[in-house]
Amino acid sequence: MQASNEWFVADAESEGMPLIVRGRLFLDALRQSGRYTTRIALVWPYGGDGKGLPTDKETRGLDLLNEQLRQKLEDEEAAILTAIFIGNRAARYEYYGTSAEEFGRIVEETFAQYPPLPIRIGAESDPEWKS
């Protein structure tokens, strides 16, 4: 089952700083499939500019590595990227996956060619996609 590649984009604010929110549209069939029951957040801190947004160079790096990871996770049907929050010196990628262990395995495999990255990953069971 393929995820839509249609997204909405919104500007918001968090802790007085600008926040860019991207959310994936038309995921009902994937949500209702019961396959992706674990909510997984990957948080990637960056230096940012004076407003807490990534610099152009940081944006290129975040986009490149995020796309590599998203493609691998979705090709292997291990996780679906559902939302991205960028601001306050961190990029937060929200996924729904089959398991935290499988997600971690693919992250390690995908990023093995790079120096250690300052990412943090958290996961929780959320079969109804309520978070």
Where are the predicted features?
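Helical (often loop-to-helix) elements that flank the catalytic cores of nucleotide-handling enzymes
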Residues: E101-P116
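Charge-rich, low-complexity segments
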Residues: M1-T82, R89, T98-G104, S131
